[in-house]
Amino acid sequence: MTKAEQKEKLWKAAHSLLLCYLDFYRKEDYKLTGYQSWKFIQWNIYGKVMISDQAIRRFLENPNMKKSSKQKDYGGTKHITCFTAEHIVPFTVVQQLFFDKFKQKDPKYDEFKQFFLKFNSLCYVWYEEDNKLNQKGLRSEVRNYPTLEKDIFHRYSLVDIKANPTKFEKGNQLFKELALLRQEDRNIKDVLSSIKE
């Protein structure tokens, strides 16, 4: 089985699973969201990864910087990575939106896929940007919930995070490409052009 075929199987499994959750919600009036019931979907069923302007700049500025570099080595206080894979729409909000949007009618497979490609998006941000989201109380909430479908980046705009879509499905692929572009001493404009979708 190719990686593309395997990925498609994951999407189909996720669709079947969440149809069960919707059915249970309608019968029992209970939204199953806890107990790691969505973990598989949270970290496997998403679109192409994104990266913030600041994360790109920080990576390009330092030839020793890696995806796995620790905050404490770059001015931070924590022993976790400098680059945080952050959900543009907090996953608890994605869950709520899913139940609200499909409360009456199950999504067809393509509709389901479009929903998660749009709303379950990961963006690599610099740790200071992640800290700003926490300080503003935006760790797990979106203040413009009713207009979320039109502007998934509203939460980021409140703390000046600029997310750049990429052509990569995984963070490892993105950072490997960034490392090659850094070796070639590319400017940020060229880098953005090379990684974009």
What are these regions (language model features)?
Residues G76-F116:
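Histidine-centered nuclease catalytic patch
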Residues F102, V142-N144:
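Glycine-rich, phosphate-binding/catalytic loops in enzymes
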Residues T84, S121-L122, I152:
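Residues that flank catalytic or metal-binding motifs in active/ligand-binding sites
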Residues F116-V142:
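Short Cys/His-centered divalent metal-binding micro-motifs
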